[in-house]
Design a protein with these regions (language model features):
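Catalytic-core regions of core metabolic enzymes
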Residues: 1-161
Length: 161
């Protein structure tokens, strides 16, 4: 699922509503959220599925004059750097995802270059697969004579795999 928070087309359908729709769509396993500076649309979104947030237009913070649409000019603590921090806090990461420094969690990653989206999403989804595999092993270990769906072996009571 790909979501753009560009404020022009869906101005009354903000990121929290997209997050709600994502959570309730069984077909969607993850989302890419494309964000622009301006507005607090994304801050209150609560994601239950993995997300890669692409926060763009950081260069605007270096300008001495306002440019862009009204939402991008009207804000305060809603510039690109602030939005990056919001998502980093949500995902529990301490930096931006780049090929040189792939920072991500099972919850998500933050990129500023759209070219990094595929690699970031792949890393996040692999982290979720590893998490799911570990949970299956833990569950199978807790149940007597349970079959491990990952390795297809039987577990005997008081023994390992």
């Amino acid at each position: 699922t790909l979501v753009s928070s560009g404020k022009d087309v869906y101005i009354h359908y903000a990121a929290p509503e997209f997050a709600f729709a994502l959570a309730n769509d069984a077909r969607s396993k993850a989302a890419v959220l494309y964000c622009e500076p301006g507005g607090y649309y994304e801050r209150d979104a609560e994601f239950t599925k993995p997300v890669v947030a692409c926060v763009v237009e950081r260069w605007k913070s270096r300008l001495t004059r306002a440019v862009g649409h009204a939402g991008a000019m009207a804000g305060g603590e809603d510039d690109a750097a602030a939005k990056e921090r919001w998502f980093m806090d949500k995902f529990g990461v301490d930096g931006l995802y780049t090929p040189e420094r792939p920072v991500f969690s099972a919850k998500g990653a933050v990129v500023t270059n759209i070219a990094h989206i595929p690699a970031a999403l792949t890393a996040v989804m692999r982290a979720n697969a590893d998490l799911a595999r570990a949970l299956l092993h833990k569950l199978a270990a807790a149940l007597p004579a349970a079959a491990c769906p990952t390795c297809l072996s039987k577990r005997r009571l008081n023994r390992g795999w």
